[in-house]
Amino acid sequence: MSEAEASGGMAHNTGPDEKTLQVLRDMANRLRIRSIRATSSSTTSHLTPCSSAAEIMSVLFFYTMRYKQEDPENPDNDRCILSKGLPFVKVATGWPGQGLGAACGMAYTGKYFDQASYRVFCLLGDEESTEGSVWEAFAFASYYNLDNLMAIFDVNRIGHSSSMSVEHCIDIYQKRCEAFGWNTYVVDGRDVETLCRVFSQAAQVRGKPTAVVAKTFKARGMPNVEDTESWYGRPMPKERADAIVKLIESQIQTNKILVPSPPIEDSPQINIMAIYMGSPSVYIADDMLSTQRACGLALAKLGHENDRVIVLDSDTNNCNFSDIFKKEHPERFIQCYIAEQNMVNVALGCATRDRTIAFACTFAAFFTRAFDQLRVGAISQISINLIGCHCGLSTSDDNPYHMALEDLAMFRAIPNCIVFYPSDAISTEHAVYLAANSKEMCFIRTSQAETAVIYTTKETFQIGQAKVVRQSDNDKIIVIGAGVTLHEALVAADELSKEDISIRVIDLFTIKPLDIATIISNAKATGGRIITVECHYPEGGIGGAVCAAVSMEPNIVVHQLAVMHVPQSGRCNEALDFSGISSRHIIMAVKCILMN
């Protein structure tokens, strides 16, 4: 260690001496200077919120946290989430309100799965305290006694365009945190000595997460800019920035830096690579089983193959059959209750640094609530798996609120997200195993309606590989489906064969990536005629995907059958027919196209 370095970190049982405190103050000012220089070179600027938290960041990174700077992926490192809208290493938090949920996932993994010493810190801005997802995370952390988690509120009073509703009424933040069962401290966010003491005390608290409410000021240390409302998003003129930098530099008393203490190396060695199906499928042809039940059985089976497989649920486990996993692996089942945004964030946190294989389950329709969390998870390139049950009209006994008819459009729009849509129990089991082995975000769309097993146990499946489930040399048209509509297509094929009309039926299996080669080659073999039939609105679903895939191919025409209006409650077969996607409507479409 050089003369200009000193050891920081919570390895010390006593508080910092005055020299260490001064180094921390100086490092906070250096952070301000770097923030000024970085933001001044941009056409937009988030300078003022960067400056308000400088002391917090100085103490956190150079006194409190334990980590190896040269090994940022080390599983024993403490974790930090900057939920003020700033990205940090593994989790891009995007719009404020998402970071604490991801921090909860990391803390849960550390406490219950890794049973390790690392701690998790999350810096939040006061403006994001108006986001409901923050308080979903507060409730989760309190319920699960995440005493290895600390949330730090940077209460600088000013939001994007105006003052916050409670401004600097620190006691309001304190009461809110305490009401959720958190150990809470109120501090002056500029006082490094108090920050050091409080951060150290929090490490000794057991059974509760800790919240630190820090009163700060935007643009701290900048004359005529500090605590004003007119500077958010504005770049500072170079001359003014240079003058402020000189002023701050004059306050720096030492050139020393602090080196963080190394982590306690007690995280277990794990392996989440190459998970295989331990035993063959037990299903036989024509067994009747819903794909969502098959998915629950597959998850439980997968849990026996690797002890890092976890399942998160939003109080729907008795509907989506994740309760099967819960019964067989209760220590790896996380009940998130009806808080879908937080469930997705927790799953993202659990999956960071490849510590778990996470599956988050709820009604497919309810994932629309968490779309922002999903898109930000894709930006972070974190591998999680989402299972959406009760898709489409298969849940038509319920009301339209439960019917997911937009979910394919949502998940197809997420970069690099793999979208599975299995049609029977065997393909569902393969989808679960393929998702577990994927390094991308995956969505598995499952149905409530019982459908027949159509594949044998010897069938193999691959991501991006469709299946031609019915064909002959005399086929005049292709019908492409998935899920319940594939079975409607097979019924239609049987009926049409009685009239000597042969059609080819394709099961897409994955909607994204799409098996373009199979679609085009079979279309060319059947006169360039394609019908897509889907239990989804026409926008963004199977029809749109197929149309895009063949758009550059001459002499191929696609006819789309989809749910064209808001559905009504009823039996599944009635709802399919009412919406124009039943076997009867497929037969009519085939005849109409062939006549023309």
Label the model's feature ranges.
Residues L123, I152, L312, C361, ...:
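Short hydrophobic segments within beta-strands
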Residues S2-F121, Q253-R445, E450-T451, T460, ...:
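Thiamine diphosphate
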